[in-house]
Structures are given as C-alpha cells and as structure tokens.
C-alpha cells in the first residue's frame, strides 16, 4: 500500500483516483502530478513501483501544498480576515455566509439549527 503525504492510498483504485484521497488534491491536480512524474493515470495504485511512488511523492512535496500545511494556511487566512475586522472577517466571526448569500431564509448549514422565537407568527 502506497503512503504519500501521510495518507495510505487505497489499494485497488486507479492512481489518479487514489491521489484524490489526499486533502488538497483533486482530479485535475492529480492528472498534472502524474503527467509531471511520468506515470500512467490508468495504473492501479497497488501496481506502482517504488520508483514511481518516489517520483509522485517528490512531485507532491515540491509543487503542491497538501494536508496539514494547506489546512494551516486556510485557517491562518481566515484568522487574518477576522483580525483585520473586514466584512468577510466579521461574517466568519458571526458564523454567517461570507459570499453574499441570502440569510432571511436558508443558510442553515452556516447558521446551525433553527432557534424558534416564542410568539413570532406571520
């Protein structure tokens, strides 16, 4: 079983799909990584040679920010917005949608479960 960026890749999947199990790598990034490493994207992950795994691992370490580093960067960017006190930071701080979505109805994912108000009717 190949272990790349601290993640055990699933055994019997195409390597292009298996790489998407790593946080920060989607289909298009996986295709670019495999093209740069010179590995066929239809190869199953359990059929990879050690040299192919090493080339993929080296390519990811050099060119792509994944897992812990990416999570840390995202949380630091959000923290920076909150410290600045800009509109987006305030929305993050209040737990409301950040990108201009409506909040009179919907937005339940971001706002959490509905809290009913006593005595409020149409």
From Swiss-Prot:
InterPro entries reported for this sequence: Rbsml_uS13_C, Ribosomal_uS13, Ribosomal_uS13-like_H2TH, Ribosomal_uS13_bac-type, Ribosomal_uS13_CS
Region (Disordered): 95-122
A Gene Ontology term for the protein's cellular component: cytosol
GO biological process terms held by the UniProt record: translation
Pfam families (alphabetical): Ribosomal_S13
Highest taxon, organism lineage: Bacteria
Keywords from the UniProt entry: Ribonucleoprotein, Ribosomal protein, RNA-binding, rRNA-binding, tRNA-binding
Any one GO molecular function term: structural constituent of ribosome
Secretion signal, residue range per the UniProt entry: none
Entry keyword annotation includes Ligase: no
Family affiliation: Belongs to the universal ribosomal protein uS13 family.
Quaternary structure note: Part of the 30S ribosomal subunit. Forms a loose heterodimer with protein S19. Forms two bridges to the 50S subunit in the 70S ribosome.
Role played: Located at the top of the head of the 30S subunit, it contacts several helices of the 16S rRNA. In the 70S ribosome it contacts the 23S rRNA (bridge B1a) and protein L5 of the 50S subunit (bridge B1b), connecting the 2 subunits; these bridges are implicated in subunit movement. Contacts the tRNAs in the A and P-sites.
NCBIfam families: uS13_bact (TIGR03631)
Official protein name in the record: Small ribosomal subunit protein uS13
The organism of origin for this protein: Geotalea uraniireducens (strain Rf4)
Organism lineage string: Bacteria, Pseudomonadati, Thermodesulfobacteriota, Desulfuromonadia, Geobacterales
Gene: rpsM
């Amino acid at each position: 079983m190949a272990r790349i960026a601290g993640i055990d890749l699933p055994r019997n999947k195409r390597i292009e799909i298996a790489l998407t199990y790593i946080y920060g790598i989607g289909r298009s990034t996986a295709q670019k990584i495999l093209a740069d490493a010179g590995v066929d994207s239809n190869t199953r992950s359990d059929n990879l040679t050690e040299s192919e795994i090493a080339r993929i691992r080296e390519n990811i370490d050099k060119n792509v920010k994944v897992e812990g580093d990416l999570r840390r960067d995202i949380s630091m960017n959000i923290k920076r917005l909150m410290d600045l006190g800009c509109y987006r930071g305030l929305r993050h701080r209040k737990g409301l949608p950040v990108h201009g979505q409506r909040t009179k109805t919907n937005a339940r994912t971001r706002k959490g479960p509905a809290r009913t108000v006593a005595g409020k009717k149409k």
